[in-house]
């Protein structure tokens, strides 16, 4: 019952360990996927930040150009105003010169006076519209035209720059929105990573608890094994003492008044029984060891014999293949000779030739020197009745015959042991050999789990 419970507990621990390892691997894969997504989002964010920085640089450049153009425009405005002021001054000077000239012309006649009056009327109108009039000189007109053209071009450039500024502002808004989205996605990914880390920590705790439980169970199992061995040895000693007491009581009952010789005989008998029991135990241990050695030796011998049989079978196969090829060649030759004879028969229908001689018999197969050499070695190594058995085993046999031979050998060996030695019952000695293998497998699995936990 204890062994079955321990096996169940070990199976449960192994299943829990496998589940924990599977969950750990899934979580690791998900963590790698999230890391890859996070790296991609980081790259996109870095690209967006670079684009934003480029847009900021371009916007700063545009703003600097606009400021430069505005300064240039203000300078041109001041130049135009100064040119207009010069034009008004020149106009006034021209008017004063005209008046002076007209005064000088008044001395000439009335016609000149009428012209002067007309000039005065024109002066009254030109005083009101002096700012709008153009300069009479060619240089002023050229400067004004150039300034107007520059103003128009500057206004057009200003409009273009304003449109570009609006576009850049819209792009900036889009980039800011993308950055905010990336930040939100990053926050979501960080939360998922934290959750996965928590789950991983839980799995690690569960696996650590499983490992601790396994170690405790292993320690308990070893303690139970030691206690069982001690109990068996104690039970054996008690059994020996009980047998001693039974014999002594039986002898005491037979003789109501025991003598000294009888007591000595009883003591000697008890000592002899004790020695016999000890020798029996030692003999049983030796028999166990010899049995294990014999099993190992028989297995090695069987493997060696099977290998030799394989080699011999391969050699026989090669010989048979050669014989088959030779027989095929002979059959071809015979067919060819039959065809030739048939042709001859057809040619000479009248004259019947005597029948051809029969083909010579096939030569016997050549003896195999390797097989004979191996049989000689076996005869020398096993010179008794076992030699005949080994020679039979060297011949190619079926697996059923091999198993029968094994069974016979084991039965003979057991009969010899039984005749010479009284063995223990089967329940005490026969123990399942699969347990240590399963425990070794569990130990290796637990060691792997410990290594995984240590690597983290």
Curated annotation (Swiss-Prot):
Phosphoserine modified-residue sites: 3-4, 101, 249, 375
GO CC terms, sorted: axon; axonal growth cone; cell leading edge; filopodium; growth cone; lamellipodium; microtubule associated complex; microtubule cytoskeleton
InterPro entries per UniProt: Shootin-1
A GO MF term: actin filament binding
Coiled coil start-end: 7-353
Protein location: Perikaryon; Cell projection, Axon; Cell projection, Growth cone; Cytoplasm, Cytoskeleton
Positions carrying N-acetylmethionine: 1
Record note on modification: Phosphorylated on Ser-101 and Ser-249 by PAK1 through a CDC42- and RAC1-dependent signaling pathway, which enhances its association with F-actin retrograde flow in filopodia and lamellipodia of axonal growth cones. Phosphorylation on Ser-101 and Ser-249 is increased by netrin-1.
GO biological process, one term: Ras protein signal transduction
Keywords carried by this UniProt record: Acetylation, Cell projection, Coiled coil, Cytoplasm, Cytoskeleton, Developmental protein, Phosphoprotein
Start and end residues of each stretch annotated as Disordered: 343-405, 418-445
Top-level taxon of the source organism: Eukaryota
Pro residues biased stretches: 352-369
Keyword 4Fe-4S: no
UniProt keyword Coiled coil present: yes
Disulfide bonds: none
Record text about domains: The N-terminus region is necessary for interaction with actin retrograde filament flow and accumulation in neuronal growth cones.
Family statement: Belongs to the shootin family.
Complex and partners: Interacts with L1CAM; this interaction occurs in axonal growth cones. Interacts with actin filament retrograde flow; this interaction is enhanced in a netrin-1- and PAK1-dependent manner and promotes F-actin-substrate coupling and concomitant formation of traction forces at axonal growth cones. Interacts with RUFY3. Interacts with PFN2. Interacts (via N-terminus) with KIF20B; this interaction is direct and promotes the association of SHTN1 to microtubules in primary neurons. Associates with microtubule.
Entry function: Involved in the generation of internal asymmetric signals required for neuronal polarization and neurite outgrowth. Mediates netrin-1-induced F-actin-substrate coupling or 'clutch engagement' within the axon growth cone through activation of CDC42, RAC1 and PAK1-dependent signaling pathway, thereby converting the F-actin retrograde flow into traction forces, concomitantly with filopodium extension and axon outgrowth. Plays a role in cytoskeletal organization by regulating the subcellular localization of phosphoinositide 3-kinase (PI3K) activity at the axonal growth cone.
Name listed for the protein in its UniProt record: Shootin-1
Organism of origin: Pongo abelii
């Amino acid at each position: 019952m204890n062994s079955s419970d321990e096996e169940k507990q070990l199976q449960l621990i192994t299943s829990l360990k496998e589940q924990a390892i599977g969950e750990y691997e899934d979580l690791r894969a998900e963590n790698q996927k999230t890391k890859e997504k996070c790296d991609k989002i980081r790259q996109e964010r870095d690209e967006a930040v670079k684009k934003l920085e480029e847009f900021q640089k371009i916007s700063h450049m545009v703003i600097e150009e606009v400021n430069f153009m505005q300064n240039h425009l203000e300078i041109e405005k001041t130049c135009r105003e100064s040119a207009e002021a010069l034009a008004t001054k020149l106009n006034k000077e021209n008017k004063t010169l005209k008046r002076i000239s007209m005064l000088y012309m008044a001395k000439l006649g009335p016609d000149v006076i009428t012209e002067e009056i007309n000039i005065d009327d024109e002066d009254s109108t030109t005083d009101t519209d002096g700012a709008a009039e153009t300069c009479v000189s060619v240089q002023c007109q050229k400067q004004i035209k150039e300034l107007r053209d520059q103003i128009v071009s500057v206004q057009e450039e200003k409009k273009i720059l304003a449109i570009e500024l609006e576009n850049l502002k819209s792009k900036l808004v889009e980039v800011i929105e993308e950055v905010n989205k990336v930040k939100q996605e990053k926050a979501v990914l960080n939360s998922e990573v934290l959750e996965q880390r928590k789950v991983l920590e839980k799995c690690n705790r569960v696996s650590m608890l499983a490992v601790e439980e396994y170690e405790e169970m292993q320690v308990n199992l070893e303690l139970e094994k030691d206690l069982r061995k001690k109990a068996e040895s104690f039970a054996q000693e008690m059994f020996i003492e009980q047998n001693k007491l039974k014999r002594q009581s039986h002898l005491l009952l037979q003789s109501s008044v025991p003598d000294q010789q009888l007591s000595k005989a009883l003591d000697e008998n008890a000592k002899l029984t004790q020695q016999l029991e000890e020798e029996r135990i030692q003999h049983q241990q030796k028999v166990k060891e010899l049995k294990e050695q014999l099993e190992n030796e028989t297995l090695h011998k069987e493997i060696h014999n099977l290998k030799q049989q394989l080699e011999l079978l391969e050699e026989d196969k090669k010989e048979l293949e050669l014989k088959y090829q030779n027989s095929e060649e002979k059959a071809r030759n015979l067919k060819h000779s039959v065809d030739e004879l048939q042709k001859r028969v057809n040619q000479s229908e009248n004259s019947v030739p005597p029948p051809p001689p029969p083909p010579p018999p096939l030569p016997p197969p050549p003896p195999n020197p390797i097989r004979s050499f191996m049989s000689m070695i076996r005869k020398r190594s096993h010179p008794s009745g076992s030699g005949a058995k080994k020679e039979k085993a060297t011949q190619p046999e079926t697996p059923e015959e091999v198993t029968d031979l094994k069974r016979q050998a084991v039965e003979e060996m057991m009969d010899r042991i039984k005749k010479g030695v009284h063995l223990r019952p089967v329940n005490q000695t026969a123990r399942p050999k699969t347990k240590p293998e399963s425990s070794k497998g569990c130990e290796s699995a637990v060691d792997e789990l410990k290594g995984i936990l240590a690597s983290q």
